């Protein structure tokens, strides 16, 4: 058994909560939790605790929810905890240098990609969007930059041809906690070996937007198919048909050519809706029309065949 560390945990969503749960099952002591302030959620816009706060309260762990760390009070609260280390996972607040320097061993972060490949807010989505063969989690010593700290541990896994951001999120949420526990064991034993990042290899994983998710049929079919998976579950790749916004849940690339303009429907039957792109043909397999759940193309065509007639130009 490695030395027990006094840990302050900072995180907010479910991804972070799974890492907190792993820490609570380890030999380490979680002495406090930092998470974002309760936010309105649901139809009633009722103030709702984050998944991390929920777990912390279940285990009687003190919870701190500052809007930021600008006040002397917030800084002093953290200092008074006398933590060995702060573990940060999808916290959502920028940490100033004074916070990074407060725990004896500084702050470490679990990042959802193989650094330095994707720094920034949407590394899971961008790895699929770009067609990367693998992804993973990187645990790094935090510095004042955006995901620029020295790397302490990397765990990898392949990106399968069927992976969406939703499925990859689940995989990384399972991979990260084990990597974190291993990394903390190395830190506690004084065996951690920081590796500097090569800035030349870094890309910025910018946030996704609904505008970006609108399909441009002039793109390559392979790129559109990756976007469909990368933008699932949000913001969802979409296009217009019969003046309705249609979300694409599943598609595949068909290696065929056509002299028809991009966006033209070549074929529409139970095997899919075949659409000309800038390079290749994209076959739409599962769609969602306004007010309905996602359905197979066969079911869509049973009720809305007129929207997808051969020769129709999608926009």
UniProtKB/Swiss-Prot annotation:
Query: Which InterPro entries does the UniProt entry name for this protein?
Result: Fmt, Formyl_trans_C, Formyl_trans_C_sf, Formyl_transf_N, Formyl_transf_N_sf, Formyl_transferase-like_C_sf, GART_AS, Met-tRNA-FMT_C
| UniProt entry keywords in alphabetical sequence | Protein biosynthesis, Transferase
Give the coiled coil ranges: none
Q: Which reaction does it catalyse?
A: L-methionyl-tRNA(fMet) + (6R)-10-formyltetrahydrofolate = N-formyl-L-methionyl-tRNA(fMet) + (6S)-5,6,7,8-tetrahydrofolate + H(+)
Record-linked SUPFAM superfamilies: FMT C-terminal domain-like, Formyltransferase
Q: Where are the transmembrane segments?
A: none
Q: Name one Pfam family in it.
A: Formyl_trans_C
A single Gene Ontology CC annotation of this entry is: cytosol
Q: What class of enzyme is it?
A: transferase
**What does the record give as EC number?**
2.1.2.9
Q: Does this entry carry the keyword Transferase?
A: yes
Q: Name one GO molecular function term.
A: methionyl-tRNA formyltransferase activity
> Which residues bind (6S)-5,6,7,8-tetrahydrofolate per the record?
113-116
On whether Translocase is a keyword of this UniProt record, the answer is no
Supply the HAMAP family for this chain.
Formyl_trans (MF_00182)
Which family does the record assign? Belongs to the Fmt family.
* Function noted in UniProt: Attaches a formyl group to the free amino group of methionyl-tRNA(fMet). The formyl group appears to play a dual role in the initiator identity of N-formylmethionyl-tRNA by promoting its recognition by IF2 and preventing the misappropriation of this tRNA by the elongation apparatus.
Q: What is this protein called?
A: Methionyl-tRNA formyltransferase
Organism name:
Vibrio campbellii (strain ATCC BAA-1116)
């Amino acid at each position: 058994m490695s030395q027990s560390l006094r840990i302050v945990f900072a995180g907010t969503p479910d991804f972070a909560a799974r890492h907190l749960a792993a820490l609570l099952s380890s030999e380490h002591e979680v002495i406090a939790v930092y998470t974002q302030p309760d936010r309105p959620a649901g139809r009633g816009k009722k103030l709702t605790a984050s998944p991390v706060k929920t777990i912390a309260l279940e285990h009687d762990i003190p919870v701190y929810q500052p809007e930021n760390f600008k006040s002397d009070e917030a800084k002093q609260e953290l200092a008074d905890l006398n933590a060995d280390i702060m573990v940060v996972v999808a916290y959502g607040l920028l940490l100033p240098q004074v916070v990074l320097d407060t725990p004896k061993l500084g702050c470490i972060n679990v990042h959802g990609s193989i650094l330095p490949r994707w720094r920034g807010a949407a590394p899971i989505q961008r790895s699929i969007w770009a067609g990367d063969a693998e992804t993973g989690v990187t645990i790094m010593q935090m510095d004042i930059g955006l995901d620029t700290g020295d790397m302490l541990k990397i765990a990898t896994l392949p990106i399968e041809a069927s992976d969406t951001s939703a499925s990859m999120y689940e995989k990384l949420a399972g991979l990260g906690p084990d990597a974190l526990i291993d990394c903390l064991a190395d830190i506690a034993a004084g065996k951690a070996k920081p590796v500097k990042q090569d800035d030349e290899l870094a890309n910025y994983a910018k946030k996704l937007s609904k505008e970006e998710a609108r399909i441009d049929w002039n793109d390559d079919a392979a790129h559109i198919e990756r976007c469909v998976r990368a933008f699932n579950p949000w913001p969802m790749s979409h296009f217009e048909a019969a003046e309705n916004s249609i979300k694409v849940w599943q598609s595949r690339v068909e290696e065929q050519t056509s002299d028809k303009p991009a966006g033209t429907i070549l074929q529409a039957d139970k095997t899919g809706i075949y659409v000309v792109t800038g390079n290749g043909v994209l076959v739409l397999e599962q769609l969602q029309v306004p007010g309905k759940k996602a359905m197979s193309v066969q079911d869509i065509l049973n009720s809305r065949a007129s929207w997808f007639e051969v020769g129709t130009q999608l926009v």
